[in-house]
């Protein structure tokens, strides 16, 4: 159906101001709508995408990260910012959440 060549960059910032940035280029042949694109085992599960729509100039992906649908156009990077909520573990220790910044570029 189409050849997809996209770059994902994720930056995570914790409450202490420490950051971690990871990038990965996905180069894949998509044969049908509904196909799963696994970015990389190193990326969290929420960055596994399902192809919902595909044309020569636009792709619609669904994923577990907010927002649920990503509309990506060639030459127009997509940016999202969200917070992964903190939690309290079984010992009562509160772990703070992280801010994440996601950029997707269709190369």
Where are these regions (language model features)?
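Generic short N-terminal amphipathic or hydrophobic helices
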Residues: 3-5, 83, 103
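Acidic, low-complexity, intrinsically disordered interaction modules
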Residues: 33-98
């Amino acid at each position: 159906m189409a050849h997809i060549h996209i770059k994902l960059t994720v930056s995570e910032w914790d409450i202490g101001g420490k950051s971690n940035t990871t990038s990965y280029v996905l180069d894949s042949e998509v044969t049908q709508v509904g196909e799963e694109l696994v970015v990389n085992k190193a990326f969290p599960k929420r960055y596994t995408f399902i192809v919902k729509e595909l044309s020569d100039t636009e792709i619609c992906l669904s994923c577990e990260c907010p927002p649920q649908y990503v509309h990506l156009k060639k030459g127009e990077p997509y940016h999202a910012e969200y917070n992964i909520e903190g939690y309290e573990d079984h010992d009562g220790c509160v772990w703070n959440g992280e801010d994440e910044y996601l950029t997707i570029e269709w190369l």
